[in-house]
Amino acid sequence: WKRLDDALPPNFKTHRNCPSIYRMVDSQCKERLWVFSAQPRMPRIVSEDGGTTWKETEPLGFECVMTFSSVVRLNDGSYLGLYHRQAGSALQVLQTRTTDGGLSWSEPRVVAEVEGKAPCEPFAFRSPDGKELCCLMRENTHQGRSLMMFSLDEGQTWSRPQDTPWGLTGDRHMGVYASDKRLVIAFRDKAQGSSTYDHFVAWVGTYDDLRNCRPGQYRIKLLRSYAGGDCGYPGMEVLPDGTVVATTYIKYRPDKEKQSVVSTRFTLKETDALQQARSADE
């Protein structure tokens, strides 16, 4: 790895709060890499040459706590961006759509607001057959479980937010489909009564498990946090050989050093074997 400071616009140093990178392709097959941040006014930079050079464009101007925590491509080639904002004492999840590869975005609208709860940090993804969108959300009161909602019409309407399975209770979910189509979703554990509370974990199960609020197959403690819950916000990738790479910021040593960016690699073949051995011991 190497730093890219010299390639970034000078004003990028003023962008604040969890910059997030997304690749988008417009209807003319033009590819762009976008980096959105939260403040001021959801600023952004863009690269049209695969990240070699970058330029700043006008901010989106959307009021937010955090920028897009999820961007999902729709069947018509447009993209849906989801984020959250403060509304008085409540939190709201909003969505906006781009039809030109990220250059312009529609007026945002609220898609999740739950009395007595605080939905935020949405992660949207497709069902294996591509027909349904699922959106997992952090529940920021941390008094119960995380939240999820579903859409069968490409995000035009969403179901009423409901509790996730206990094992998916946490912050800033991000997931991938493994080569066998099982879901691997990583997050900061916030499940009440969990032995891995505040650590960096992953949930393994099927989409049907999630859709029907079943527990899933098992959970994995990926990394121990030595700074309480100050970890997570992962990136997730599946390599061609099926290896899952989960990357997070975390304080992974009990010393004076602060957080590092750490990647952990595993295959479901390995974790399945560990789970089988554990079950046999029990």
Go through each PLM region and give its residues.
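Asp-box/BNR beta-propeller blade signature and adjacent active/binding-site loops
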Residues: 1-282
